[in-house]
Structures are given as structure tokens and as C-alpha cells.
Amino acid sequence: GQESLAVAGNIFLGQTEAPLLVKGYLNKMNKSEYFLLMTGGMATVAGSVLAAYIGFLGGDDPIQRIEVAKNLIIASVMAAPGAIVISKLMFPQTEKVDKNIEISSEVTGTNLLSAINNGTRDGIKMAVNVGAMLLVFLALIALVNGVFYQIAEVFGLNDWIQQNTIYEAFSLELILGYLFAPLMWLIGVATEDITLMGQLLGVKLAASEFVAYIELASLKDIGSAVHLTYQKSVIMATIMLCGFANFASIGIQIGGIGILAPGKSKLLTEIGFKAMIAGTLVSLLSATFVGMLLG
């Protein structure tokens, strides 16, 4: 149905583009279906950004680029069924599913030109909303980090942090990073790498997977002063970071999906944070399976 179509689309489409595949069904979908829609978006990445990630991690080495591309594609494909499993465990389908949905020609368009017009209009409205929500969430994260920095500066913590960690100051990323270090141990990461892996997950959640992959590119370089000890950790990190699950994405999805189904905006805000958690669990599940196979 519409759920499987959206999840399948999320493998290579973005978290705001995939919902366009099921635009005509959005107003009739229930809470469990919306949760899967959002989780699928959080657990995967858009094909348009895969090239950037390959560039970050593969550098100028064509063989390394191929290996990174394989890992990223594997992560995206694994995330689709994982999103279904995790989302239905967190929000089981208890409501009646409407299987008799009629889609008006106003939604799909009466002809080719009408469909192009509708798609262009929806795309522009979505882009504006997504841009606004992303700007607000990134600004909020910057505000929190600014407050943390000033507090740490009073107690002289920033200098100590700069000398002893990969961070320059006390921040939300640092807190989340060390908070998730025990979780990295639970999914099978080597003890030597759990702190760095936890920091990568923290950066992904607080900032974005883009920033986390840039940091991973540095941490995978054995010539760096601070780097991951094992190649297995590098591969697991590549899989774990392959998803849009972060705080900014909550706003992106609320803005993107909300413009397509204005009546569901309240529901989107209610389940947005939980969808981010679910998307993170999907990525961790994929990384765990890959770690088991690597031994």
C-alpha cells in the first residue's frame, strides 16, 4: 500500500520527496502509517547526497570510493525493512486502515500539463517550508551551544575540553557523544573506539549526518592524531550515519509533509521526536548486523 511505496521510495529519494509519492493518501493515513512514513525518512538518505558522502570518505582513491558506495547503498537498502520493523514495534497498526481511498483529479492532475503544474507548485511550497524549518532548528541548536559555551567559559572547562577531546568547547554534540558511548559498546564496537563512535552519533543527531561524515573522514585517517582503531569501526560508522535522523530533520519533515497535509501538522509534531529515535534505532540495527558479519 501507500506505506510500502513511501518506504521503498525513501531508499533513494529524500525524506520530503518520498511523501510526494503518496500525496493523495496523506489525509486518510492513520497515526501508525504516518509514523512509518516519518521513520522511513529518518532512517534513509537521499540518492542526491550519496555522491557527497562518497567524496568525503573515498577521497581521490577510486577503489576506496567504490567500497564506500557499496557500504552506503547497503545501508540504504537495509534501512527500508528495518524502518518497517522498528516503527511497527513502537506504533503497532491498531486503527482500521482505509483501503477505499478515492483520489480526486485535483490531486493528481487532469492531464500532463496539469500534473506538471501541481508538482511544481507542491515542490516550491515544500522547499520554502523545509528551508524555513531547517533554518529555525539549526539556529536553535546554535543558541543552545552558545549558552553551553558561555557557562563552560565561566568555569574554565572549554580549554580543558579543547585539549582532551576532539571538540573545541562544551556543546550539545559533546554531551550526546559521550552519552552514546555505552550504546556503541552494546552494538559491538571495540572498546577503543566507543567514545569516538558515540561522538559521531552525537554529532549526527545534534547537527546532521553531513557534519558527522566530514568528521568520520578525519577519524578514519590513521595519520590523524585522533582516529578510529579498527577498520570494522569505520564500516560500522559509515552504516550507522547513513540516515537523516537528527533534530533538524524533525522540523524538515514537519514542514515538508505538513504542507502536503495541513490537517496532520499536530500529529507530525507529536510523533516527530519519536520518529527520530526510531530512525536512529534502524541505523544502529543495520550497523549491528554488519558488525556481526564482519566478526
Predicted segments, located by residue:
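Hydrophobic, small-residue-rich membrane helices and short re-entrant helix-turn-helix hairpins
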Residues: 111-128, 149-156, 167, 261-273
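Alpha-helical membrane segments and immediately flanking helix-loop junctions
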Residues: 1-57, 112, 198-277, 281-285, ...
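Transmembrane helical segments that form the transport core of multi-pass membrane transport proteins
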Residues: 124-221
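Inter-helical loop and helix-membrane interface segments of multi-pass membrane transporters/permeases
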Residues: 26-29, 54-68, 106, 152-169, ...
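Conserved, well-structured core segments that form the ligand-binding/active-site neighborhood
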Residues: 29-39, 49-52, 56-97
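Long, contiguous bundles of hydrophobic transmembrane helices that form the permeation core
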Residues: 77-126
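Hydrophobic core segments of alpha-helical transmembrane domains in multi-pass membrane transport
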Residues: 43-55, 75-91, 133-146, 180-183, ...
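Small-residue-enriched core segments of transmembrane alpha-helices in multipass membrane transport
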Residues: 41, 72-85, 157-181, 273-281
